């Protein structure tokens, strides 16, 4: 990996190249890559377990929320680990199960922000040309699937260093509801 390489993840490096090519135009509202692995966004008092387990890589909005990779199961290929949303107002959730799912979510069109993302069409074309991917058609269904797949493990991991987090309790409640609904359909 050269010193000019953004990250150890080829997919993320390609996104960085795309972002640089369309800059200053936005391709997803509020999204912007920042220094890969910059743990300062976790806060100076973040526990070691959090600093070791999360790899921040992008701002999610204009007010301090960010995305981070969750080093799940010590996977060597970081493009296969879940992407976590860490909100500036305390929100915390699993945004995508892996990097390519995340890229698809970035392409979702929100009619309210159409004027703020002039490079969205260029991004969608790039996404299809580069990875053969299209925008997620049903973000809520993807969220549910990702929560079912990774939610319990993520909450268990988070609770190893923060056992009084109401956001995690909410995630666990949401996960239990999803599991119950899935069992009822079973």
Walk through the language-model features, giving the residues of each.
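Solvent-exposed, non-transmembrane amphipathic alpha-helical segments
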Residues: 77, 103, 119-122, 178
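A surface-exposed partner-binding patch
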Residues: 1-79, 136-186
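Compact, glycine/acidic-enriched structural inserts
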Residues: 81-119
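Residues that form generic nucleotide/phosphate-binding pockets
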Residues: 18, 102-105, 126, 130, ...
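An amphipathic alpha-helical core segment
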Residues: 111, 115-155
